[in-house]
From Swiss-Prot:
Keywords: ATP-binding, Cell inner membrane, Cell membrane, Membrane, Nucleotide-binding, Sugar transport, Translocase, Transport. The lineage of its organism: Bacteria, Pseudomonadati, Pseudomonadota, Gammaproteobacteria, Enterobacterales. This is Maltose/maltodextrin import ATP-binding protein MalK. It comes from the Bacteria. Its main location: membrane. It is a peripheral membrane protein. The complex is composed of two ATP-binding proteins (MalK), two transmembrane proteins (MalG and MalK) and a solute-binding protein (MalE). The keyword ATP-binding applies. It catalyses: D-maltose(out) + ATP + H2O = D-maltose(in) + ADP + phosphate + H(+). Belongs to the ABC transporter superfamily. Maltooligosaccharide importer (TC 3.A.1.1.1) family. Part of the ABC transporter complex MalEFGK involved in maltose/maltodextrin import. Responsible for energy coupling to the transport system. ATP binds at residues 36-43. The gene is malK. The keyword Translocase applies.
Length: 369
């Protein structure tokens, strides 16, 4: 096992900058997820750790040793790709042992490692089968098993579940989580799927256009996003944003004026907030309330109703702003498109963002954080 340290890592292809000043510490045995939209540089960052891409500048340490010039085979890493990359003419056992044979490992040790890993991944009864006789989930487990038998210090997983259907993704998420708890090895996982990030990670690294937007535990990012990008990326449906103006500011609260001219005090730090400033109020769809449950309300016209069975998502057009607000409520809500609908804003659940996108620190203590 090993910790991973990236210090001022910078990557460019010609004039195209992919990673900018990446500073990150990944602890020994930690499960870290790189998440972000397409093109944010998350896979390139993983490939630099693996040694498949050169680092333009900066330093990479694995287990305290500089790895910039060390070839991939000597870094003590194992990598699982989006594509399973299994040899179709070889059995499961032969696929899992292929790398060990090339490395000159003795047959008895190969047999022991393959069978041990097969038991862990519930593949023991499939060792004689070829890939064409396996399901997608089984093939992915074989690809993971091929990495496990090499006994790496650090596991790198590049969108390993993206080729699976929804049911298999859920199953494999659970299996990967159990595997990490059992092995206690350092794992670095790349995905664009925030559900995978939230459910698997000890720590999430949110990337935006080659920069680290925020690093933190899943619930920290959900409840206390450092900026508007993270607030809008983490959570589904994404956070609602409203244009507001600051009408008063104190050290531990800020008063803002909503688009309907209501004024409300928010429990956020106000030391660096200027009266008269234009800001954005953010609130998650699941934190909105029925209008009867809050003194602060907004009224609008229902544009779309999405009935999901376990919950209802209502898209509401608020006068004086151009975007819809999304209100999410557990269970079925019977309303009609075109009807007038009122929602309540609980001040303690609101976020406040400056014009540059940075967040004012929330002072309300959320559970589990």
């Amino acid at each position: 096992m090993a910790n991973v340290t990236l210090s001022s890592v910078y990557k460019a292809f010609g004039e195209a900058v992919i990673s900018r000043d990446i500073n990150l510490e990944i602890d020994d045995g930690e499960f870290v997820v790189f998440v972000g939209p397409s093109g944010c540089g998350k896979s390139t960052l993983l490939r630099m750790i693996a040694g498949l891409e050169d680092i333009t500048s900066g330093e990479l340490l694995i287990g305290g040793k500089r790895m910039n010039e060390v070839p991939p085979s000597e870094r003590g890493i194992g990598m699982v790709f989006q594509s399973y990359a299994l040899y179709p003419h070889l059995s499961v056992a032969e696929n899992m042992s292929f790398g060990l044979k090339l490395a000159g490992v003795k047959k008895a040790e190969i047999y022991q490692r393959v069978n041990q890993v097969a038991e862990v991944l519930q593949l023991a009864h499939l060792l004689d089968r070829r890939p064409k006789a396996l399901s997608g989930g089984q093939r992915q487990r074989v690809a993971i098993g091929r990495t496990l038998v090499s006994e790496p210090d650090v596991f790198l997983l590049d969108e390993p579940l993206s080729n699976l259907d929804a049911a298999l993704r859920v199953q494999m998420r659970i299996e990967i989580s159990r595997l990490h708890k059992r092995l206690e090895r350092t794992m670095i996982y790349v995905t664009h799927d925030q559900v995978e990030a939230m459910t698997l990670a000890d720590k999430i690294v949110v990337l935006d256009a080659g920069n680290i937007a925020q690093v933190g535990k899943p619930l920290e990012l959900y409840h206390y996003p450092a900026n508007r990008f993270v607030a809008g990326f983490i959570g589904s449906p994404k956070m609602n944003f409203l244009p507001v103006k600051v009408t008063a500011a104190e050290p531990r609260q800020v008063q803002i004026e909503l688009p309907n001219h209501q004024r409300v005090w928010l429990p956020v730090e106000g030391d660096q907030v200027q009266v008269g400033a234009n800001m954005s109020l953010g609130i998650r769809p699941e934190h909105l309330l029925p209008s009867s449950a809050s003194e602060v309300t907004l009224e609008g016209e229902i544009q779309v109703v999405e009935q999901l069975g376990n919950e209802t998502q209502i898209h509401i057009q608020i006068p004086a702003i151009r975007q819809n607000l999304v209100y999410r409520q557990n269970d079925v809500v019977l309303v009609e498109e075109g009807a007038t609908f009122s929602i309540g804003l609980p001040p303690h659940r609101c976020h406040l963002f400056r014009e540059d996108g940075t967040a004012c620190k929330r002072l309300y203590q959320e559970l589990g954080v």
